[in-house]
Amino acid sequence: MVKSFRMKALIAGAAVAAAVSAGAVSDVPAAKVLQPTAAYAAETVFSQNNGASGFLPGRYDVQAMAPAMFNWSRESRFAGNTDGTLKWQNDIRTTPQNGAGAVIDGDGTVYLHSRDGEMKAFNPDGSVKWVTGNLGKTYTQSPVLGTNGVIYLASYDKKIYFIDKETGEILTTVPLSGGPSSETVIGSDGTLYFSTLDNYVHAIKPTSKSTWTERWKLKTNGVVSSVPVLAKNGTVYVGTYNYVFYAINSGTGQVKWSRTTSNAFKGYPVIDKDGNIYAGNQDGQLYAYTSTGSLKWTFPLNGFSSSSPAIDHNGNIYIGSGSGELFSISKNGDMNWSFYTDGPVRTAPLIDAKGTVYFGSDDMKVYAADANGNELWSYQTDSNVVSSPQLAEDGTLYIGSYTKLMAFGK
């Protein structure tokens, strides 16, 4: 059954009509119809700002198809080619934080961290290229691919691993004061930013494939609940479980400003080309802040949000909700459409070059919706779909559930 913005539009329209006939002023948002667009001219190499975003370009492997899960717009330069046909699946247990999932290098190798404490590298046909074990169990984090052929992975055994991308060899480890509460992100000079469960945000700089130095660490008011992101102006943004959102100078570790809300920010924020920050909160709202910390607007998500948003080249923001909805919201805070599922949407959506939006739900389905929120296809899995999707150059979609890594394509 197609569950799209159409039902939302009918309900909203009926509510508005009833309010008008009664002489009342209605604040029910109307769903907008977005005109389908052809695939736009995307970057030929990976760009964190392959949309209308304002991230600080880091030393990621730009020849990779998708070197990071977070700290970018999540608008892919590739077009998906799948109608929901499953190419292959591989048993792998994941318990991701913040919608963590796989990354893809330039030759199509897919890297994923498992709940069993293994980093696995899969060939594009689903065969296993290599496995590196004993990396820490429990929650799984997304690896990131650096420019030097090194994979960086934050692990719950209180370490950051430097792993050779080609062989899986552990090159070195960075001991941590607490288990990581976020993925690692890479700055413009190669500095790694991450947070730990003892309330610190850290900045360390690799000096080779196997050496590093600490730049700074900042004690926050509580465990960091969101993945750090870096804006073009050099600001690191994070939220905590103690309901505070921080803007931090990435060079010094000094707090620039902070704002208190009624609950915790989860996932990671996105940043638009003007420096505005958009972050979902457990209080059920999407917050929009300016780069100086002024609140622009909030948007009600009808349920808690642990989903990370994505932003497209028109400035539209896409985010999931505990209500089971995926929302498309304009940069002005107006609803374009919402798409209904039968379970919380915790994954970060992915937008392809044609405007198709891919995401997963706790109703154990993978979904694809067009630019107007109409369902294109869905696929029933055997467990909650909790890791966020990625696209390869050939249009293959990779996404994980609690039990499997799945590849969809033709």
Swiss-Prot record:
<protein>
    <recommendedName>
        <fullName>Uncharacterized protein YxaL</fullName>
    </recommendedName>
</protein>
<dbReference type="GO" id="GO:0005576">
    <property type="term" value="C:extracellular region"/>
</dbReference>
<dbReference type="InterPro" id="IPR011047">
    <property type="entry name" value="Quinoprotein_ADH-like_sf"/>
</dbReference>
<feature type="signal peptide">
    <location>
        <begin position="1"/>
        <end position="41"/>
    </location>
</feature>
<keyword id="KW-0732">Signal</keyword>
<dbReference type="InterPro" id="IPR002372">
    <property type="entry name" value="PQQ_rpt_dom"/>
</dbReference>
<dbReference type="InterPro" id="IPR018391">
    <property type="entry name" value="PQQ_b-propeller_rpt"/>
</dbReference>
<dbReference type="InterPro" id="IPR015943">
    <property type="entry name" value="WD40/YVTN_repeat-like_dom_sf"/>
</dbReference>
<comment type="function">
    <text>Increases the processivity of the PcrA helicase, but does not bind to DNA.</text>
</comment>
<keyword id="KW-0964">Secreted</keyword>
<comment type="subunit">
    <text>Interacts with PcrA, Pdp, YclM, YkvL, YhcQ and YomL. The interaction with PcrA is not essential for cell viability or repair of UV-induced lesions.</text>
</comment>
<dbReference type="Pfam" id="PF13360">
    <property type="entry name" value="PQQ_2"/>
</dbReference>
